[in-house]
Amino acid sequence: ILLLLLTTKIFSQEMYNLETCETDIAYNVPQFYQDFFQCVKVRLSESGDYVNLYFNAKPPYQTWYYDASNVTSSNNPNWIPFQSTGPGSYQNPGVIAEQEFVISVPVNPTPRQGVIINASTVDGEVTTSDYEYPMGSIGAALNGVTLFNPLAAPGDIIENEAFSFDLYNGHPAGDTYHYHT
């Protein structure tokens, strides 16, 4: 009986996708969040000045970056075998793990004044400008996947890292699946 229960649990795992992910959006957040976000929890801050997005960064589709140890598509329906996306493509060693991210977005953002975007502020190097995004998570995509800046990890080149993107143009850094902006 125990084997039957374990087998049933293993084979009954539901695919994580836009229809099955948890979406919990408060009624009092701006309409944009209600209309476009999925796979997230969205709440207005106590002050009413920020919208807080809570998300797990798991991609709501199939990818080879879900944990493949002892899995098949029958016991992890989100895992698929690696598929080449072209010459030079490869699977990086990262494996997706559920995360707990919170991003706070001002309800009424104010643009920075006097910022000039040129080659010195967008030079592909981290920490050379006060206007660069930090490394790591900088936001949330509409489907609850985390966003990283447009750069690769220090020592890597984003054009080379792109060869490790999956069918949806994402990949993990360690266990954090993400897109680059």
Features from the language model and the residues they span:
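Sec/Tat signal peptide C-region and signal peptidase I cleavage site
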Residues: T8-S12
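Solvent-exposed N-terminal domain segments of exported/luminal and surface proteins
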Residues: Q13-D156
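Solvent-exposed loop and beta-edge segments used for protein-protein assembly and interaction
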Residues: A97, H171-A173
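Short helix-loop boundary/capping segments
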Residues: D156-E161, T181
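Short, recurring structural edge motifs at helix starts
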Residues: A162-N169
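Histidine-centered catalytic micro-motifs
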Residues: G174-T181
